[in-house]
Structure formats: structure tokens, C-alpha cells
């Protein structure tokens, strides 16, 4: 396997998490997503709930407030500390074993490695809304709000910590539209690229 590590960034509702999990199962490699949260919490001393809410997403306040609030004398915030712990864990996991890592800016964190396939999964809005309503058992209006809010926070976090644009094709090896290709085809394409 030329590419040992697969990172999957994704739009909310695109099925990126599901696709990544299926790829890991089919390849027989480790899968890291929310299971990283416990490690981050343990090493940072913060609660898993706090990590769940803040490790991949920017706080619910605006990007300006995110950039300047709650920083110590060195200029570091709690979010910066969490990001640094998360970064170190991702680097350790990449050294340890072949794996699929979902989100958490892993594509950027591992950008200097030659054995990484960076994938961005996106989808058509109607299909994403339909998937969110089904998975989370919410009305369409709530699904739209969830989709917009979560992607906005993912983008703010990614753009802030990487100085790159979230979802921009140049930042990834492969960009796949799960609505157009379907999950099975996305999985096959990813596996063909490693």
C-alpha cells in the first residue's frame, strides 16, 4: 500500500464519515473519528463533552471572537491547546499504523508525509438535507440549519488553524461528490488511489 493513511474531510451530510468507515473495514485498517476525543480529553485534562464540541469545530461565536477571546499571556487559547494535543495524537496515529482519519484537520497536519491520501467528500444540497433529516430525525428546516452551522464552524476552524481554505480542491488529493457518485463508488475510487 503506497498510501498508508487516508484522511477524509467532508461536508456535513455528505456521508464522508460512513464512506471512511467502510473503506477502513474493507482495507482492514484502523479507523479514527470520534474515538480520538477520549485521547484528546485525557491528554488535555478537559472533558470529552468539551472536546466533542470544540476539537473539530470553531466555537459558536464568530471567527473574529474566536481569534481573540480567552487567550493567555502567550497568546494561546484553550482551543489552541486542544488543537495542539489533537495534532500530536494524529501524528502519533499516522506513525503507528495504516488508518483512516476523519476530519480534525488531519489532511493539513499530515501534509508533509508522502504516504497520505487526502480526500474531501462533498454532496449536493438536496441529498445532504435528506440524509440529515433521516439520520437525525429532524424536520427539513432544522436539517438545513444543522448543515449550514456545522459546515460554517468546520470551515472557520480549518481556515484558522491551517491558513488554507476548507474544501478547496488544491488542498486535497481527491475531491468526490457523494451525491453524484454514490457511496460505493466513492469507496472504490479511494481504494483504487492507494
Placement of each model-derived feature along the sequence:
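Pre-Walker A (Motif I) flank of P-loop NTPase domains
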Residues: 2-11, 97
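Glycine-rich phosphate-binding P-loop
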Residues: 8-21
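Short beta-strand-centered segment that lines the nucleotide-binding/catalytic pocket of NTP-utilizing
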Residues: 30-41
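ATP-dependent small-molecule kinase phosphotransfer cores
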Residues: 41-98
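Small-molecule kinase domains that catalyze NTP-dependent phosphoryl transfer to phosphate-bearing small molecules
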Residues: 59-66, 139-184
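Short, amphipathic alpha-helical "lid/cap" segments that border enzyme active or binding sites
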Residues: 87, 183-191
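RNA pseudouridine synthases
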Residues: 93, 109-112
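Conserved phosphate-donor/acceptor-positioning beta-strand/loop module used by diverse small-molecule
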Residues: 112-134, 140-150
Amino acid at each position: 500500500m503506497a498510501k498508508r493513511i487516508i484522511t477524509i474531510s467532508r461536508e456535513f451530510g455528505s456521508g464522508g464519515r460512513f464512506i471512511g468507515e467502510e473503506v477502513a473495514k474493507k482495507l482492514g485498517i484502523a479507523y479514527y473519528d470520534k474515538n480520538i476525543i477520549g485521547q484528546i480529553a485525557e491528554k488535555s485534562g478537559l472533558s470529552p463533552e468539551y472536546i466533542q464540541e470544540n476539537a473539530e469545530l470553531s466555537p459558536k461565536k464568530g471567527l473574529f471572537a474566536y481569534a481573540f477571546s480567552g487567550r493567555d499571556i502567550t497568546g494561546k487559547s484553550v482551543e489552541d491547546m486542544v488543537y495542539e494535543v489533537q495534532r500530536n495524537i494524529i501524528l502519533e496515529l499516522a506513525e503507528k499504523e495504516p488508518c483512516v482519519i476523519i476530519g480534525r484537520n488531519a489532511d493539513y497536519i499530515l501534509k508533509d508525509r508522502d504516504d497520505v491520501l487526502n480526500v474531501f467528500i462533498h454532496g449536493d444540497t438536496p441529498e445532504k438535507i435528506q440524509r440529515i433529516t433521516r439520520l437525525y430525525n429532524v424536520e427539513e428546516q432544522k436539517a438545513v440549519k444543522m448543515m449550514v452551522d456545522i459546515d460554517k464552524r468546520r470551515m472557520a476552524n480549518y481556515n484558522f488553524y491551517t491558513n488554507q481554505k476548507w474544501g478547496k480542491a488544491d488542498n486535497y488529493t481527491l475531491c468526490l461528490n457523494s451525491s453524484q457518485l454514490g457511496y460505493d463508488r466513492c469507496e472504490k475510487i479511494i481504494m483504487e488511489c492507494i
